[in-house]
Amino acid sequence: TCLGVYILALKDGILKQFDQLKSRFERLSFVDAFWHLMVIDAITTREIAECPKNIGLTSFKFNMGYKGPHADLIGITATDDGATYKGFRMISALGPPSIAACHTENIDIHLMLRDELIAQGRKDYKVWNESRPPFVEAECMRRAIYLAKNANCPLYIPHITIAEGVDILAEAHRDGINVVGETCPQYLTHNGEDPAPILVEHPACACVNPPLRDRSSNERLWEGIRRSLIQCIGSDLAPATLAMKGDSIWEAPMGLGNISELLLPVMLSEGVNKGRISLEKVVEVCAYNPARVFGIFPRKGNIEVGADADIVVVDLAKTMTVSPRTLHSMCDWSIYDGWKFTGWPVYTILRGEVIVENGEPRPRAPGQGSYIPRNTLT
């Protein structure tokens, strides 16, 4: 019912383009959304101070894990530590609900390992994790948290993949640091030890940042959710068809497709029905916590008079087998192809209106979605 969307505002920043972007979004969208600004240059850094009061945007992403070929592919640059710390201080000065988000991977070590592995002729699916090993993520997580601590800046770390990440979050919470951890369905269910067939057949599909890890990381991340160390679940959706992925893992666009639509079935089937977490925990990490973290509560993530009446009705006994042919995405493959999930949404309700029933969108004209400003404007 409501998406958190990262905005890559190239050239002129977001403020000059905001009215145009908002108009286009609200003309085409079927659901609501709030936006995060990707801080990629001097312009977007300056805009941090203006976004909350001018456009109701209070979350800002720093790309510590991107430079080189993949950054060039999507038109972004890495944020060095000085620029990151400067941005953190600016966000701290804004006050709640403003928050920084960081993609945490040590990109310099990745690029060094990448060159070594390419020289060896490696192009199998396992090579992606080897080029971005767990310590690369752990080191950058610790660095981002340390910078945020010294700037007194709230920090959101998306798509955590590593077992050590749970320990890092526990240490930060013990030290009283305001850091929120997020993981994604794919990192709870998939790994390089039991690879999805599509990754073996088409290694370029394994190009996702951070990479899929190992079985022990899968279970430690579930533990992190149970212990409220990981407080949010995201999709990190980045769809690409097999043709777009191509034949080279080193040149493929990043991301795994068909994740958003399966986020809730994963949490219900692999989480609730297998006894890993409670249904209440699913509500907490998928709705209540994200709404509070990003300043859209109590309008979203909440059921009470005055809230938006965004509701999902689920059937914990409903069993279906996943196929890319029945999913609603441009992506023609899925790491979940053939998985049988028990626990599916049966009604999705946006602002009191049923918009999806038994997995099929109801006929509606586009333009039903709204941009959701944060509470700073109210």
Predicted regions and their residues:
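A glycine-rich helix N-cap at a beta->alpha junction
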Residues: 24-39
